């Protein structure tokens, strides 16, 4: 992995940078939630606005004692070339696979990959380890049924924000049971990989409600199943790490990419200039550039690129 400064930040045209900057100048900034009552209100408001895609096939995974809802979106007008198992973001406490339907449908059509979105259980009603248990169950289900259900064993695992954290912990669990090799790659977008108080990045989020909701009951949050940056990262598949320079979790992503590389894994780190958390899901030129680059990486990593 090349950590030379010139290679760290992606090139963005002046026009795209200006248009993207204008979008964020007029967009209200998100603020951290103060507690459970506010979380319930935000969840209710999001639910009222949520309209999932009619293309999504809703199913349930039953694996190792866990029952996990999933949403499957297949590519239109082309055969399934592979499968992306995707964990949505939302601070561990308000994710929804349906909220990603539009994004997942675009990716399915652009790549030929079926996208399986996972509705893992949410904190604080279901704190750690509920979410990684559900994500692991979904991964094990896909490994077992991919050939019969989708006609392919070309699998890739990914997550967005909190979902990227869960993707990393899921891979570590699979690796420990000799199953991580079933996935040809991992897509990690803007995850939080240190929920402890031991590093500056960990201390930066320690007072946020999502930490309390997800893992506030755990005395040592540096355990790898919560903070994967502290884990033994050897033996993981090729990984793409994507983050923006204005993202509060930028240090976490630099740390995770460096530790993955130091452990001998193939790592691609892409940092986009002047964009905040979750930028790749925003309707901006830079967001679209990142999404297209991710599509290409997914196909190349699975050996499906042109």
Residue ranges and their predicted role:
Residues 81-90:
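Short beta-strand element of the alpha/beta-hydrolase
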Residues 169-221:
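Hydrolase active-site cap/lid region
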Residues 126-146, 294:
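Alpha/beta-hydrolase active-site loop
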Residues 241-243:
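Short beta-strand/loop motif that positions the catalytic acidic residue
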Residues 284-306:
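Catalytic active-site module of serine/aspartate enzymes centered on a nucleophile-bearing elbow/loop
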Residues 148-161:
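Alpha/beta-hydrolase fold nucleophile elbow
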Residues 1-75, 285, 303-306:
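A glycine/proline-hinged amphipathic helix-loop "lid/cap" segment
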Residues 98-117:
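Short amphipathic alpha-helix adjacent to the substrate-entry channel of hydrolases
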């Amino acid at each position: 992995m090349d950590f030379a400064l010139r290679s760290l930040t992606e090139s963005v045209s002046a026009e795209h940078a200006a248009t993207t900057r204008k979008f964020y100048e007029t967009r209200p900034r998100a603020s951290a939630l103060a507690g459970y009552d506010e979380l319930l209100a935000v969840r209710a408001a999001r639910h009222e606005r949520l309209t999932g895609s009619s293309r999504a096939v809703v199913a349930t995974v039953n694996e190792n004692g866990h029952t996990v809802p999933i949403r499957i979106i297949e590519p239109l007008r082309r055969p399934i070339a592979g499968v992306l198992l995707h964990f949505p973001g939302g601070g561990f406490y308000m994710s929804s696979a349906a909220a990603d339907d539009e994004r997942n449908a675009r990716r399915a059509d652009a790549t030929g990959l079926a996208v399986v979105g996972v509705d893992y259980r949410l904190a604080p009603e279901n704190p750690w380890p509920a979410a990684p248990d559900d994500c692991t169950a979904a991964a094990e289900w896909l490994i077992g049924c991919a050939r019969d259900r989708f006609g392919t064993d070309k699998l890739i695992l990914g997550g967005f924000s909190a979902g990227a954290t869960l993707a990393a912990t899921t891979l570590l669990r699979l690796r420990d049971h000799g199953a991580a090799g079933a996935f040809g790659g991992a897509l990690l977008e803007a995850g939080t990989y240190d929920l402890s108080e031991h590093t500056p990045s960990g201390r930066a989020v320690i007072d946020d409600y999502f930490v309390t909701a997800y893992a506030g009951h755990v005395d040592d949050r540096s355990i790898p199943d919560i903070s994967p940056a502290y884990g033994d990262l050897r033996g993981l598949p090729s990984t793409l790490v994507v983050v923006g320079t204005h993202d509060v979790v930028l240090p976490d992503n630099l740390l995770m990419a460096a530790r993955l590389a130091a452990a001998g894994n193939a790592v691609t780190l892409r940092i986009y200039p002047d964009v905040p958390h979750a930028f790749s899901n925003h309707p901006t030129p830079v967001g679209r550039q990142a999404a297209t680059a991710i599509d290409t990486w997914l196909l190349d990593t699975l050996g499906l690129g042109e």
